[in-house]
Amino acid sequence: MKVVLFRDGRPGVAAALPGEAPETELSDLLGGEPDVTPLGTRLELLTLHDAERQQLPIRYSLHRIGRAAEPVAGDAVVVRVGADRNYRDADGNDVEAANCYLRPTGR
């Protein structure tokens, strides 16, 4: 499965996850149980559950129309979701859209 990976305060890049169980792989990638935030109709932001409580650094800010920017602690993954709510491979347009939503803070 192809996702958009945000790591170490850098812009998101396309990354392929090996294997058959994307939910397990995403949990392993983030280091624990993910929180899911919808980004429009076809993308979801996955961040580490309780990342702020674990005192991870704020590396990104989430930008959505009509809302103030929200801090995002630690690394993140953006996944594409189909109409059936199953994960799909992210494409170049998804990478571009994900980088509009999630921006490095420069810290």
Predicted features along the sequence, with ranges:
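Short beta-rich binding modules
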Residues: 1-107
